[in-house]
Amino acid sequence: MRIRVKICGITRLEDAMTAVHHGVDAIGFILWPQSERYISPEEAGQIVRYLPPFVQAVGVFVNPDKSWVEVASAAAGLDLLQFHGDESPDFCSQFHLPYIKAVRVRDGLDLLQYAQCYEGSKGLLLDAYAEGKPGGTGHIFDWKLIPSGLSLPWILSGGLHSDNVVDAIEQTRPLAIDVSSGVEIANGIKDADKISVFMQGVRSCENV
């Protein structure tokens, strides 16, 4: 089965085009101004213009105002919303675009119940938990905490890079994976060689 890939934290057109060249399915833009990988909606929109058909533009938000989501998604030309904070199901589902909900996985969190709460989403993005950080920690979490029988599709995230992505896929068999810092040379600056090696690892796991 083909594994979907999103490269997140894109800030440069050249990095987006490199990702597209290597067959990614989605490009993620951090639309949370406090992030070191923040990009303005207008700048994101200039990149989205060059994305080919079937490559999704995903906007990442953290506890935003409704108006910010509406303005930013329109200016950037987004296809999908990703909520990475404490947004409620009602908040996430009020927009005209589909969404995925990030969850920071840790001991004691009932992912089965969480999935039921966000049943209107297109899926859950499973990320590592770190106190006071909504995401982008660069750390993995204990993949054994992922239960079988989740009612939603899910995306594996958190600390993935070329040295662990094969193990991650073999152990968890996700629908999709999400990477950011694992293919960077600096915050928001991707590395073409790292993207290439990472994608080779992903593709080696398909049809196995």
From Swiss-Prot:
InterPro entries: Aldolase_TIM, PRAI_dom, RibuloseP-bd_barrel, TrpF_fam. It catalyses: N-(5-phospho-beta-D-ribosyl)anthranilate = 1-(2-carboxyphenylamino)-1-deoxy-D-ribulose 5-phosphate. It comes from the Bacteria. One of its GO terms (molecular function) is phosphoribosylanthranilate isomerase activity. One of its GO terms (biological process) is L-tryptophan biosynthetic process. SUPFAM superfamilies: Ribulose-phoshate binding barrel (SSF51366). Keywords: Amino-acid biosynthesis, Aromatic amino acid biosynthesis, Isomerase, Tryptophan biosynthesis. CDD domains: PRAI. Pathway: Amino-acid biosynthesis; L-tryptophan biosynthesis; L-tryptophan from chorismate: step 3/5. Its EC number is 5.3.1.24. Belongs to the TrpF family. This is N-(5'-phosphoribosyl)anthranilate isomerase. It comes from Nitrosomonas eutropha (strain DSM 101675 / C91 / Nm57).
